[in-house]
């Protein structure tokens, strides 16, 4: 990176202007400082450090209006919502979960400039619901920090997630001495039962989504599919499994997500093209060049 900086030193470094929005944040960190910020995030992502972040309700690692996108799910706005999903989703080893809790990580790729870092991190999860199976999960991230060292934007991709789901099904098949189809059916039953138990406990009164446990179970096992690897943000059981973890923190917000309507998260409201071309981020990820064609920037 320093070699390229030397080559470009005589050149004017233009901000990336797109629809009047640029990466004009005053933060201008060194590579070492960005590395430290990256490490700080992942240190807090691990269990049990993530529990403390969840208990804070609004993690100080995020700005108040943080924007986040995860490829297999959806976009998440604001510090409270991101605290619940980024830290709360993987913070209870005793609760049924697909991947369990993160216990270690290794950053395998890293490059940084100004207030942005792009990295690949292999996170080891203890899949406590699958016999404490240790799973390496590869997560690609782009993270942008403000001048106070808080995350203002992130874009995350779970690499090889379909392969991961198949591995979990195979592990379950081995444990029940059955076929992959039998394991998938067993997983469907386990997830549906857990979602319905959570609904019965937290989604009461105005937050109730199903008439009773039987109606809940029947809907989750017959009316919607389990879901594919890219459908954790669509009308599937896997999507409701993700949001089930969050219900305890804010039933009013999250109960609809596990209900029949799916709220505004577990719904089939996007085509493939709309997903890819969604205008979302407030600040351009492009720095150092006067590029005006970033189609991901919001209006």
Curated annotation (Swiss-Prot):
Q: Member of which family? A: Belongs to the bfoA family.
Gene Ontology MF term list: acyltransferase activity
Pathway field of the UniProt record reads: Secondary metabolite biosynthesis; terpenoid biosynthesis
Q: What GO terms in the biological process aspect are recorded for it? A: terpenoid biosynthetic process
Keywords (A to Z) from UniProt: Acyltransferase, Glycoprotein, Signal, Transferase
Q: What is this protein called?
A: Ophiobolin family sesterterpenoid biosynthesis cluster acetyltransferase ATEG_03569
Recorded coiled-coil stretches:
none
Free-text function comment from the UniProt entry: Acetyltransferase; part of the gene cluster that mediates the biosynthesis of an ophiobolin family sesterterpenoid.
Leader sequence segment? 1-20
Enzyme Commission number: 2.3.1.-
Glycosylated residues, chain numbering? 28, 58, 77, 126, 177, 212, 282
């Amino acid at each position: 990176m320093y070699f390229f900086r030397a080559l470009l030193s005589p050149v004017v470094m233009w901000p990336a202007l797109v629809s009047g929005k640029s990466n004009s944040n005053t933060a201008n960190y060194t590579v070492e400082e960005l590395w430290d910020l990256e490490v700080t995030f992942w240190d807090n992502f691990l269990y049990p450090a993530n529990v403390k972040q969840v208990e804070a309700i609004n993690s100080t690692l995020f700005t108040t209006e943080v924007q986040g996108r995860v490829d297999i799910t959806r976009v998440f706005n604001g510090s409270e919502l991101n605290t619940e999903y980024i830290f709360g989703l993987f913070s209870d080893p005793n609760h049924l979960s697909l991947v369990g809790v993160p216990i270690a990580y290794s950053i395998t790729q890293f490059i940084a400039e100004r207030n942005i870092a792009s990295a690949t991190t292999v996170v080891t999860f203890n899949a406590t619901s699958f016999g404490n199976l240790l799973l390496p999960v590869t997560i690609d991230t782009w993270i942008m920090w403000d001048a106070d060292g808080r995350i203002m934007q992130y874009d995350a991709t779970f690499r090889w997630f379909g392969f991961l789901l198949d591995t979990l099904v195979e592990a379950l098949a081995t444990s029940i001495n059955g076929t992959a189809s039998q394991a998938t059916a067993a997983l469907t039953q386990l997830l549906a039962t857990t979602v319905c138990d959570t609904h019965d406990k937290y989604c009461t009164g105005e937050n109730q989504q199903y008439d009773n446990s039987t109606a809940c179970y029947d809907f989750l096992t017959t009316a919607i599919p389990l879901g594919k690897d890219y459908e954790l943000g669509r009308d599937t059981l896997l999507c409701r499994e993700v949001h089930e973890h969050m219900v305890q923190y804010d039933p009013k917000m999250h109960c609809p997500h596990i209900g029949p309507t799916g709220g505004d998260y577990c719904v089939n409201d996007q085509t493939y093209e709309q997903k890819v071309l969604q205008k979302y981020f407030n600040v351009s990820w492009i720095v150092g060049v006067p590029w005006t064609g970033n189609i991901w920037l919001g209006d």
